Structure formats: structure tokens, C-alpha cells
Amino acid sequence: MSDVQERLKKLGLGARTGTGKGTPRRKVKRAPARSGADDKKLQLALKKLNTQPIQAIEEVNMFKQDGNVIHFAAPKVHAAVPSNTFAIYGNGEDKELTELVPGILNQLGPDSLASLRKLAESYQNLQKEKGEDDDEIPDLVEGENFEGEPKVE
């Protein structure tokens, strides 16, 4: 009987709910609070600037100095044109220029075109280096026909 009571005490120690005197309260694990207060402050500041939402913007790309791009897919954009202020909401992703190349060519300015040229030159240099290391491809010998049945010697 006392053996059973000891086992119950061991099990009960981990699950104290705070019903008796002197027992610590159980900690409630909470998710981190959302930044709702910051969003409200930002909305008030944008309202003071008289920003208007801009519809039908599919993507926003911000080009960084190191050649990478901050890419926003389907962002919310607010603008105050008289004060030259734009606010972009959404999840931004750091991407390399090569990841966005086919669709981003019409958005490139002179600085970005220079980085694209450097990227293309480095790619060509890599291709030249790979061309020099073609040890896997044998050279063709004149007068030999490799399309027929193999000759066993």
C-alpha cells in the first residue's frame, strides 16, 4: 500500500496545479505577442502623411549594393506622392539577382545592369574553365567509325 502511495507522489510532483498552500503556480507558455502596437503607430504616422493605398502591384524589388535583391511578392503598398513617401508591407526575401533574372530584366537600372554584366562575365569564365577540363569526352580519330558494331580484338 505504501509503495503505491510513493509512486502516486512521484507522479503528482510533476503535475502540481496550484490547488494547495505553498504550491507554485504552473507557468503558462504563451506565444510571443504580435507587434500590433507598432503597426498601429505606423498606421497613424502614415495617416498623418495622407498616404493612399496603391492597388495591383504584383511585386517589389529593392536592389542592394552587394548585388542582391530584396524581393516582395504580392506586397501592400501605400504612397504619399507629394511627400515622396512609400510604405511597403509584406514578407521580404533576400535573393540573388540570378534567381530573378528572366522576369527582372526590364526593371534593371544602369547600376544593376553593371552587376548583371559582371555576373555574365563570371559565368562565361566558369564555362571556359569547364571547357578546358573536358577529360571525359574522347577525341575523335579520323577514319574510325564508332556507329557500327564494336570490333573485339
Swiss-Prot record:
InterPro entries: BTF3 (IPR039370), NAC_A/B_dom_sf (IPR038187), Nas_poly-pep-assoc_cplx_dom (IPR002715). Its main location: cytoplasm. One of its GO terms (biological process) is protein transport. GO terms for cellular component: cytoplasm; nucleus. It is found in: Cytoplasm; Nucleus. Residues 1-40, 126-153 are annotated as: Disordered. Keywords: Cytoplasm, Nucleus, Protein transport, Repressor, Transcription, Transcription regulation, Transport. Pfam families: NAC. CDD domains: NAC_BTF3. Belongs to the NAC-beta family. Component of the nascent polypeptide-associated complex (NAC), a dynamic component of the ribosomal exit tunnel, protecting the emerging polypeptides from interaction with other cytoplasmic proteins to ensure appropriate nascent protein targeting. The NAC complex also promotes mitochondrial protein import by enhancing productive ribosome interactions with the outer mitochondrial membrane and blocks the inappropriate interaction of ribosomes translating non-secretory nascent polypeptides with translocation sites in the membrane of the endoplasmic reticulum. This is Nascent polypeptide-associated complex subunit beta. The lineage of its organism: Eukaryota, Fungi, Dikarya, Ascomycota, Pezizomycotina.
